């Protein structure tokens, strides 16, 4: 009996831990996005007729998470804004972060134009399409650091000076109009081998001008006229070079600047600081606690990602236990395609519950507007660990990470 005593004691000690483990339930439901439906109805978009399909997802009624935005300790940020039917999340999330940065650094409130950045990103995509003779990826999306790249070249504008919405429009609709027309035109350029950059760029700009309006060359603020470059330098006073991108993928060497291997990184930026998962999470935890907000990007296709009233993102216990979320688990999902670079978001707050962080996420996509906290998601720390691939933040918030690099 004595030789079994240590084993019995271990089992007794483990029983309370076992009892405390969260055991989630699954349900099969038709995923509905009420806000997206209302946008499509407003835009008179016809949906293809198909029978509703029930999908396996988490029963969020069993999840004990934050109940309200007010529970979070948050940094200053402007209210959420809808991106409509478009792939502009990369710009909405990063612009939101930079608006928060302006306030953090100077206390000023400046609402910036996302569509001005998007306009010039389309132009740069067209240039690259010509340069590579049609081999570059052409899609609606991009990455967070595209905002920094565009600002350095073209500057920026206040939101009131350039909305990208024609008179009477309420929602952006690039999926049915702007993007298909540009994409079709570039396909015709490739088919005809008509690689005249000046012609291609001027045609793409004509399409952009038709749907978004031409961006102003000069803006007047408080009685002073500025070009977009002057507005960035003299009014906004944000240095795009002060922001860094962190990545955590074990397929790339640790502690090196690497390329983020996803289609939306169409210009093959290799400016991502690749670090192990624990350091990636430590950087996020440290930054938000020091008052820095963070742009994050990753996957939103999971059964633990609510499209409805819950407004949460968690990793169900029947997916993977929290203790097993590590570098290998992340990489496995990225390698097999179940984690993708779906969406860009703005992390603006945190609250600690039961020893784990919940993050307040400002979101521009329609599904964030179906809950009791419209425009926001509540992300559990484990969801960020498993499914968020990269993030952007001020370099001062990442000093400890950057010190590991040569």
Question: What are these model-predicted stretches?
Answer:
Residues 1-22:
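Bacterial Sec-dependent N-terminal signal peptides
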Residues 21-23, 198, 202-406:
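Active-site signature of cysteine proteases
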Residues 114-222:
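Papain-like cysteine protease catalytic cores
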Residues 91, 116-119, 147-150, 158-161, ...:
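Structural recognition of the beta-strand scaffold that forms the well-ordered cores
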Residues 21-79:
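N-terminal regions that are enriched for targeting/export leaders
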Residues 67-83, 108-117:
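An N-terminal structural lobe/cap that precedes and organizes the functional/catalytic core
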Residues 86, 90-102, 106:
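Alpha-helical support elements that line or immediately flank enzyme active sites
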Residues 75-87, 132-138, 267-274, 283-284, ...:
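Second-shell loop/turn segments in exported
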């Amino acid at each position: 009996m004595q030789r079994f005593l240590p084993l019995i004691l271990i089992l007794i000690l483990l029983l309370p831990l076992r009892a405390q483990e969260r055991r989630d339930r699954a349900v099969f439901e038709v995923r509905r996005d009420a806000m997206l439906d209302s946008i499509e109805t407003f835009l008179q978009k016809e949906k293809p007729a198909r029978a509703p399909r029930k999908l396996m997802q988490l029963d969020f009624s069993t999840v004990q998470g934050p109940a309200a935005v007010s529970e979070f300790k948050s940094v200053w940020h402007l209210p959420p804004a809808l991106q409509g039917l478009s792939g502009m999340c990369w710009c909405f999330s990063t612009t939101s972060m930079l608006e928060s940065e302006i306030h953090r650094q100077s206390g000023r409130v400046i609402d910036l134009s996302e569509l001005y950045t998007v306009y010039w990103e389309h132009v740069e995509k067209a240039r690259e399409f010509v340069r590579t003779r049609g081999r570059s990826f052409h899609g609606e999306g991009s990455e967070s650091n595209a905002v920094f790249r565009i600002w350095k070249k073209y500057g920026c504008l206040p939101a009131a000076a350039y909305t990208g919405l024609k008179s009477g429009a309420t929602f952006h609709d690039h999926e049915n109009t702007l993007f298909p027309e540009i994409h079709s035109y570039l396909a015709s350029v490739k088919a005809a081998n008509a690689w005249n950059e000046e012609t291609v760029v001027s045609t793409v700009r004509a399409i952009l001008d038709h749907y978004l309006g031409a961006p102003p060359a000069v803006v007047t603020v408080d009685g002073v006229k500025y070009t977009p470059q002057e507005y960035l330098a003299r009014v906004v006073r944000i240095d795009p070079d002060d922001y860094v991108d962190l990545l955590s993928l074990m397929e790339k060497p640790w502690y090196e600047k690497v390329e983020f291997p996803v289609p939306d990184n169409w210009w093959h930026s290799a400016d991502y600081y690749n670090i192990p998962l624990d350091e990636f999470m430590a950087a996020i935890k440290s930054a938000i606690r020091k008052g820095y907000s963070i742009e994050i990007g990753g996957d939103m296709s999971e059964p633990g990602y609510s499209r409805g009233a819950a407004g949460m993102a968690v990793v169900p216990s029947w997916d993977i236990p929290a203790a097993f979320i590590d570098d290998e688990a992340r990489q496995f999902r990225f390698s097999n395609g179940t984690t993708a670079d779906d969406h860009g978001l703005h992390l603006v707050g945190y609250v600690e519950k039961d020893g784990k962080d919940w993050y307040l996420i400002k979101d521009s996509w329609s599904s964030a507007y179906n809950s009791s906290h419209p425009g926001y998601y509540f992300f559990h720390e484990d969801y960020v660990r498993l499914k968020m691939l990269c993030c952007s933040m001020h370099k001062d918030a990442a000093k400890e990470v950057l010190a590991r690099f040569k």
